[in-house]
Structures are given as structure tokens and as C-alpha cells.
A protein has these predicted regions:
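Mid-chain, well-packed structural core segment of small domains
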Residues: 92-120, 125-130
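Cleavable N-terminal export/targeting peptides
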Residues: 1-24
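Mature soluble domains of exported/periplasmic/lumenal proteins and thiol-rich metal-chelating peptides
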Residues: 111-115, 138, 152
């Protein structure tokens, strides 16, 4: 699983920017409202020019982190998840008659997760790796030509709000 995600990242950071449409790319930050907060950063590159029939597709590469502290009588435990992934995002704005600033979308990709549990001093931390499908659907609202608000539902972070900076 790690090899697939590494290949996806290499593809996204080398090949995708070469075919990305200027002015339709973005970087952003997000905050998942589930699990007491999931922080994330992402980059998204429009590849519609290289798609058959110019389909409105972009590639999203992201990192998300969730961390929680649990105090106990024996000490404090900290649990954290790091998720790295890539997804193909389809823009449905041309399929619906909406305000041009509203952009509904859905996406599917892969995510690799690393979880770590550390305990009181003297106990070694434990960690595990996993991964799987990443599913996302949401809507973006262009507040200005350079900034968009994002609201989505995904399977890592749940209901998520964010800000995207277009370039």
C-alpha cells in the first residue's frame, strides 16, 4: 500500500504540474469537525486539458493529522494519525445550473495512514500502518478569484471546512 501511495505522490508532484491548467490550481488548509479536529493541507492540480473531452478533473494530494491526548492516573497517553493520500476530483459545476461561484465536486483516491500511541515516560511508543480508499464529496464557493471556501464530507475527518488559495 505504501508503494502505491508513494508512486501517486511522485506522479502528482512531477507529471501533474506539467499538464495543470494555469489559474485552476490551488493549495489549501482544512479542519475536520469530527474526532475533535483533523488538520489538513492539500494541493490540487487541474488536469482537464489532458482528459478526453476536456472532462473537469483535477488531482488532489493531501496530508491530514489527528491527535488526541488522554490523561490517566498512570500518566498521559497521546494517540495520533497521519494520513497521506491522492485523489481524482470531478467538478460537477458544468452539470448543474448554479451560480458560477458554486462548484460541487466528488472524488475518489487512496490514503495511507500511520497511527502512533505513546504513553507515560519509559514506555516505548507503538505504531501501525494501514490504508485504503479515500472518498470525498463537497462544494466550493469562490469568495474572490483568488480564495475559495470549501465544505466537504470525507471518510477521514468527516465534515470538513477549509480555505483554498487559487493560482
Amino acid at each position: 500500500m505504501k508503494k502505491i501511495v508513494i508512486v501517486a505522490f511522485l506522479f502528482a508532484f512531477t507529471a501533474v504540474p506539467a499538464v495543470a491548467a494555469e489559474g485552476k490550481n490551488n493549495v489549501g488548509v482544512s479542519y475536520g469537525l469530527d474526532l475533535d479536529g483533523v488538520l489538513g493541507v492539500q494541493g490540487e492540480f487541474d488536469i482537464s486539458a489532458s482528459m478526453p473531452n476536456k472532462a473537469p478533473v483535477s488531482i488532489q494530494v493531501f496530508w491530514k493529522n489527528y491527535s488526541q491526548t488522554y490523561p490517566t492516573g498512570a500518566g498521559t497517553y497521546q494517540w495520533s494519525y497521519n494520513g497521506f493520500g491522492a485523489a481524482a476530483i470531478y467538478d460537477f459545476s458544468s452539470s448543474f445550473k448554479l451560480d458560477s461561484r458554486i462548484k460541487p465536486y466528488a472524488g475518489l483516491g487512496l490514503i495511507a495512514l500511520n497511527s502512533t500511541l505513546s504513553g507515560p515516560a519509559g514506555q516505548p511508543p507503538t505504531s501501525a500502518d494501514s490504508g485504503g480508499l479515500y472518498i470525498v464529496g463537497g462544494v466550493r464557493y469562490a469568495m474572490t478569484p483568488a480564495v475559495s471556501a470549501d465544505l466537504n464530507l470525507n471518510n477521514y475527518g468527516g465534515l470538513t471546512i477549509g480555505a483554498l488559495f487559487n493560482f
